[in-house]
């Protein structure tokens, strides 16, 4: 990446016209997931250089995958056909795939129930329990993702760790999943989703005998800890919420986001907090978060491949997704972090360093 290496240092070589060899430094369970991500797919340079829109033109979008582009109708659908030149074509059972551009959850549900849609990621959350109970062909698969609330680390009020702990512990995650979302979501006790798997097939999170996420970082995923939350709020100087400034929760327009905000408003109200809800259009919302012009906001993240680094690298100082402002602004020079990776075979050990000197490593 720095441009100081040599070709001999790179463990990648083409053995012949159809075989690529990659030498890994260590066993990497997610490697095949990684190279199947679209950024690693080979691209015909002569086609990609023909101008904007080549990837939507069947005559120019050349692929080497299981399917090729037959038709692209903007705002309607994309039609893929089986590639008879694919190396593993005998194990490709579908003659083609038609992908519909549908953003409305109700329209997607109607298409599914009419037999016009087989797979979708867009359904009204309140309909999923009914479909699971009544439709033997309906299958819901977990995503490598987490919906979460993010605190602006530079913002007044929530830059106090005790305030953040109080607000977090007051949330009844199970109630939000079961009564607000009702879409099969499970309570989270930590940022990295339980759908991440080890090479053994087991979850990377600690699970109980029933497959539920267990308590981590003081967070009980199955109920709120209101009494403990009140203790942290008092430690921050706001006993029973007295003197606590008004909190604004920012979210984007969309299915369920306002309902989650209203649930949080009620839960934080138990601590004596006054909470206002603010909704923004999607593009404006993204810009507001990125600029750090908020205190508390909703967010969600879905990983690109099966490894926690897909989540954890969001918080490095210069990440484009570091909306919580770790190591930015007034906190950039704060030498308050420590890290010790020597027990894991690394040389890194920092005491009282900046965020960049610790987490970024």
Regions found by a protein language model. Give the residues of each.
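Short helix-loop capping/hinge motifs at secondary-structure junctions, enriched
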Residues: 86-89, 155-163
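Extracellular/periplasmic solute-recognition and catalytic clefts
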Residues: 70-81, 98-155, 174, 178-180, ...
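A local structural motif
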Residues: 22, 89-100, 241-248, 266-280
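Short helices/loops that flank or line small-molecule/ion binding pockets
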Residues: 106-116, 130-133, 161-162, 262-271, ...
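Gly/Pro-rich hinge or "lid" segments in bacterial periplasmic/extracellular proteins
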Residues: 2-9, 13-19, 24-96, 106, ...
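Ligand-binding "clamshell"
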Residues: 128-140, 292-293, 307-325
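Extracytoplasmic/peripheral linker and loop segments enriched in polar/acidic and small residues
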Residues: 1-8, 12-13, 215-222, 274-285, ...
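Append "and occasionally in soluble cytosolic enzymes with long acidic Gly/Pro-rich linkers
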Residues: 82, 159-266, 270, 335, ...
């Amino acid at each position: 990446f720095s441009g100081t290496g040599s070709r001999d240092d790179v463990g990648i070589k083409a053995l012949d016209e159809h075989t690529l060899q990659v030498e890994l430094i260590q066993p990497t369970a997610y490697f095949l997931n990684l190279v199947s991500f679209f950024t690693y797919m080979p691209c015909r340079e002569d086609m990609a250089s023909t101008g904007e829109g080549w990837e939507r033109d069947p005559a120019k979008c050349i692929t080497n995958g299981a399917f090729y582009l037959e038709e692209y109708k903007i705002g309607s659908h994309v039609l893929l056909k089986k590639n008879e030149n694919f190396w593993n074509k005998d194990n490709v059972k579908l003659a083609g795939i038609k992908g519909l551009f549908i953003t409305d959850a109700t329209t997607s549900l109607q298409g599914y129930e009419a037999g016009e849609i087989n797979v979708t990621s867009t359904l009204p959350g309140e309909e999923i329990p009914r479909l699971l109970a009544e439709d033997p062909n309906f299958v819901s698969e977990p995503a490598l993702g987490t919906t979460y609330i993010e605190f602006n680390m530079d913002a007044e009020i929530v830059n106090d760790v005790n305030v953040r702990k109080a607000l977090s512990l007051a949330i009844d995650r199970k109630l939000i999943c079961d009564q607000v979302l009702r879409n099969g979501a499970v309570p989270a006790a930590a940022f990295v989703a339980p759908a991440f798997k080890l090479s053994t097939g087991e979850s990377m999170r600690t699970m109980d005998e029933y497959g539920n996420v267990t308590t981590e970082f003081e967070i009980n995923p199955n109920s709120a800890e209101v009494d403990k939350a009140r203790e942290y709020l008092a430690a921050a100087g706001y006993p029973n919420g007295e003197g606590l400034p008004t909190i604004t929760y920012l979210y984007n327009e969309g299915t369920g986001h306002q309902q989650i905000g209203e649930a949080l408003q009620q839960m934080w109200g138990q601590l004596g907090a006054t909470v206002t809800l603010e909704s923004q259009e999607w593009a404006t919302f993204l810009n507001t978060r990125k600029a750090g012009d908020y205190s508390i906001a909703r967010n969600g993240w879905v990983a690109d491949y099966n490894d926690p680094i897909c989540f954890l690298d969001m918080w490095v100082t210069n990440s484009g997704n570091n909306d919580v402002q770790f190591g930015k602004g007034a906190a950039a020079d704060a030498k308050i972090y420590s890290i010790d990776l020597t027990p894991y075979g690394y040389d890194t050990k920092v005491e009282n360093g900046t965020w960049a000197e610790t987490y970024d490593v």
